[in-house]
Every structure is written in C-alpha cells, then in structure tokens.
C-alpha cells in the first residue's frame, strides 16, 4: 500500500487558559509532504509543568523514532518509545523537582507501508473521517468513559460530570508506567482525513460538528 498525504494542517491555541499545555509534532512551519510521524500531546491540567510534559513527550518519542526505527513501527516498538519518554520524564524531574507530578496525554499517527498506525494514551482523540462520516475514533482513557462503559452514567451525563477531566492513563514516568492502545488502519481511501485533537477541542465540538467540518459543509 502506498499512502500519500495532502498538506497537513495544525492549530494550537491556549483558549481561555493562562498557558498553553498542548504540544504538536511536527510544527506547522516544519511539516513536509513526506512526513510520516504526527503527534498531539496535552499536558494534564493541574499537574506541575504540563506544557513541559507535552513538549518532552513529543521530543523524546520523535527522537526514539528517528534514532531506532528501521521499518514500520510495531506495537513493541511503540511501547519502547513510550517507555523512553517515561525515562526522559524521570531525568527531567530529577533535575527539576518542582515538576514532580507532570503528565501528558499522547495521540500519534504514523504513515506506514501497511496502513496508518495509531497510538493513544489519555483523553486526547484521533478520528478517521471519510465524506463526512466518522469511520473510527479512539476510546478515551478517562474516568467518565469508564463509568459510561459500566452503565453508571450516560454519555450525555459524562459531558457535564464534575470529574470529566480525570484521565486514567498518562505518560508520567517509570514510577507510573502506562501503555498505549495501538491499532493499524488498513482501509485508507483518497480524500480521507485523520484528525488528532485534545479534549479542549472536544469540549467545543461534538462528533456531528466535526464530521460536518471535514465534509466541507461549514
């Protein structure tokens, strides 16, 4: 399978927050049409130095890929990349003790020869869209999603639940190791879209609106 991409687009804003805890890779001014690795990370709100956590995750995982990847990434390779990021977190916190507790989500897409490899940790999300239809979306590693799956609350109640921002997986360091959910999308067609976003976007846009945007109806 040969997958070619159109011009990637990226937007990052702090919105109503005092600082922007999101990080993206590659930066918009650095992206090229032969780019294969894409990431969006969101420093966990309330944790110390969330913006450092998201940036460090992007930087360390990109470094691991560029240094060690010889072919398409396997799940084992991605797990090792996440572990490397956790080791980098440990090193940073050792030098900056005030950053203890920093954490970040991860969404990652890699354009491979066999399809598009997706990995995610936390409540940032990845969508695969075609002609205004959401074909696939990642499942949030969040407290409210767990409650929905258990039948304790409804999806509608999850939107306003007081603990809707609590996540149950994050990159934090080797003291709290985590694991990414990984999947390969093989059904890729011309004019498909991949959308990687943080929960800040999802607080403003429901799935129906996201589908409309990527169908060019807005």
Residue ranges: model-predicted function:
Residues 1-218:
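PP2C/PPM-type serine/threonine phosphatase catalytic domain
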């Amino acid at each position: 399978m040969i997958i070619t991409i159109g011009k990637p687009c990226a937007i990052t804003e702090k919105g109503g927050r005092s600082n922007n805890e999101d990080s993206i890779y590659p930066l918009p001014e650095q992206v090229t049409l032969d780019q294969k690795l894409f990431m969006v990370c969101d420093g966990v709100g309330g944790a110390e130095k969330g913006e450092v956590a998201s940036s460090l995750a992007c930087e360390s995982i990109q470094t691991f890929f560029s240094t060690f990847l010889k072919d398409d990434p396997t799940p084992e390779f991605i797990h090792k990349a996440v572990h490397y990021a956790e080791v980098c977190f440990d090193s940073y916190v050792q030098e900056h003790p005030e950053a203890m507790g920093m954490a970040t989500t991860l969404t990652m897409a890699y354009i491979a020869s066999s399809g598009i490899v997706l990995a995610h940790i936390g409540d940032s999300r990845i969508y695969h869209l075609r002609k205004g239809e959401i074909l696939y979306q990642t499942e949030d590693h969040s407290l409210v999603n767990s409650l929905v799956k258990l039948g304790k609350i409804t999806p509608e109640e999850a939107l306003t639940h007081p603990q809707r921002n609590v996540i149950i997986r994050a990159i934090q360091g080797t003291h709290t190791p985590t694991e990414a959910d990984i999947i390969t999308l093989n059904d890729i067609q011309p004019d498909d879209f991949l959308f990687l976003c943080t929960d800040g976007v999802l607080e403003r846009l429901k799935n129906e609106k996201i589908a409309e945007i990527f169908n060019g109806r807005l």
